[in-house]
């Protein structure tokens, strides 16, 4: 039994039923009493009673909390929600579609949250959540049944590859890992668009993650004695791992190798290298996601689905050498 079914049974709109549980003064006491009485008869009063905790609770499902990219997103969400007088609760999905679906069901059905945000959604379930839900970066078919906010990494990566080409680079490599195949696809598209040869010898998909992926990935290229002049890394931690390897070999960026990262994390600016990177515009995607979610929480009858794409952008710094000046 959910609020929509209670709405049908009592004859009141879904918005009115929701207001009865939130303690709203916008409906009469008589109307509220009828709805609450029926809810108690049906055994769902405790499930939906929100008066025990007046602040709005937003459940955020996140693949992990080790990555700076995800912690940046969570930090923005916490900041914005605090400013709006709301509370965030975070659950980790471990990149698992089944775990994600279980958490959606948990928060949706037990009244523990008013709305849900799913970061990098993996679940392909077509079921509607019983409470408002927004996907932040989702699979292609998700927009058919849920609001989706997606980052277009293709745009920023295309800008990055164009920057490398304009600076005379033809031998461009890629280092990523199994969880970054979307960026690998974007890299391939960008290389093809600019008519640049993709050398399989310059592509590494590492089993390791973070700095280890960059260090071990570039070591594999180094051992082949046939290096590219530039490397695009799926995220900045990978780029930092490449830099660590180069420093051990007493090589410098960009003199000996040009590097571009992705996600534009703050930690990259603390290193000696002023790393060029792809910015995901985290602030924008968080603000848009919450705007849509809070609107639907406050107005349950609002059913319009939105599919918003936010472009990434290439942030040029000083980690690319201009080969045209040689």
What are these regions (language model features)?
Residues 55-162, 222-223:
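Alpha-helical recognition/docking segments in bacterial nutrient-uptake
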Residues 81-93, 173, 188-212:
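Short beta-strand elements in bilobed, periplasmic/extracellular small-molecule ligand-binding domains
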Residues 16, 51-66, 163, 171-177:
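Short beta-strand segments enriched in small/hydrophobic residues
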Residues 219-326:
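Flexible loop/turn connectors
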Residues 1-54:
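N-terminal helix-turn-helix DNA-binding module of bacterial transcription factors
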Residues 160-195, 201, 302-320:
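An alpha-beta-alpha
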Residues 69-83, 156-159, 179-197, 213, ...:
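Short, solvent-exposed amphipathic alpha-helices that sit
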Residues 147-174, 211-220, 239, 280-298:
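Hydrophobic alpha-helical segments within soluble ligand-binding/sensing domains
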């Amino acid at each position: 039994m959910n609020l929509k079914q209670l709405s049908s049974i009592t004859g009141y709109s879904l918005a009115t039923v929701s207001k009865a549980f939130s303690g709203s003064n916008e409906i009469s006491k008589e109307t509220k009493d009828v709805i609450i009485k029926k809810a108690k008869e049906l055994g769902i009063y405790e499930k939906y009673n929100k008066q025990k905790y007046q602040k709005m609770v937003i459940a955020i499902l996140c693949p992990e909390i080790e990555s700076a990219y995800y912690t940046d997103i969570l930090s923005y969400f916490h900041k914005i929600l605090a400013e709006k007088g709301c509370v965030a609760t975070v659950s980790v999905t471990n990149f698992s579609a089944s775990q994600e679906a279980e958490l959606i069901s948990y928060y949706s059905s037990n009244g523990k949250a008013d709305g849900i945000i799913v970061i990098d959604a993996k679940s392909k379930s077509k079921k509607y959540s019983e409470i408002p839900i927004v996907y932040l970066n989702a699979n292609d078919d998700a927009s058919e049944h849920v609001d989706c906010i997606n980052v277009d990494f293709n745009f920023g990566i295309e800008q990055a590859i164009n920057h490398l080409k304009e600076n005379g680079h033809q031998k461009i490599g890629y280092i990523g890992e199994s969880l970054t195949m979307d960026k690998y696809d974007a890299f391939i598209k960008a290389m093809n668009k600019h008519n640049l040869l993709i050398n399989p010898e310059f592509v590494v998909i590492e089993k390791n993650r973070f700095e280890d992926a960059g260090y071990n990935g570039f070591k594999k290229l180094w051992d082949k004695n046939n290096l590219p002049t530039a490397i695009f890394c799926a995220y900045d931690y990978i780029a930092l791992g490449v830099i660590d390897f180069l420093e051990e070999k007493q090589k410098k960026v960009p003199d000996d190798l040009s590097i571009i990262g992705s996600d534009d994390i703050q930690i990259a600016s603390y290193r000696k290298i002023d790393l060029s990177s792809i910015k995901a515009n985290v602030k924008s995607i968080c603000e848009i996601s919450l705007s849509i979610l809070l609107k639907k929480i406050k107005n349950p009858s609002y059913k319009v689905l939105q599919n918003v794409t936010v472009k990434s952008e290439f942030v040029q710094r000083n980690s690319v050498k201009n080969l045209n000046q040689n």
